[in-house]
Amino acid sequence: MQTPTITLRKARRADAPAAFELRNRAILHGCRHDYTAEQLQLWTSGEFSEKFENTVTHHFHLAEIAARIVGTGMINLHTGMIDAVFVEPDVMGQGVGKRMMRHLETLARAAGLAEIRLDASLNAAPFYRTQGFEGDEISLYQSPRGFSLPCIPMVKTLS
């Protein structure tokens, strides 16, 4: 099977609804073996909001295959914190997440960051380890919407 061509670009305001739906599909599919139904419901029950739309518009990067949005990710270039890395379930395992992580790491290096960090969902930690991240301790991610989820804080030193 031929590997699909993945293109990356900065998100636009019009991409926000698609990014929101992709996020929810990725969570419900990818996290279903590591989180309870109640946790998944809390995680995905929020409404599409102006705040999310603004975050996508100003911070998200998108991965596309054949002009279809199949992945998201963002990095805070002041803190090195990576967030919102989500991949469409039907293309998981086809290099989309890896390509997004390389892109975000390139941005971090260009900004002069010494390290990058993220809070990995329990199911995603093995993937991030393959990308050079370290961390094994389970912690709690505190959602701004008032609930918490187990996660694994991870860090990667950039050389």
Task: Specify the residue positions occupied by each region the protein language model found.
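Conserved G/P- and acidic residue-centered "switch" motifs that form tight phosphate/ATP-binding loops
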Residues: 95-97
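C-terminal "cap" of GNAT-fold acetyltransferases
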Residues: 118-125, 131, 141-159
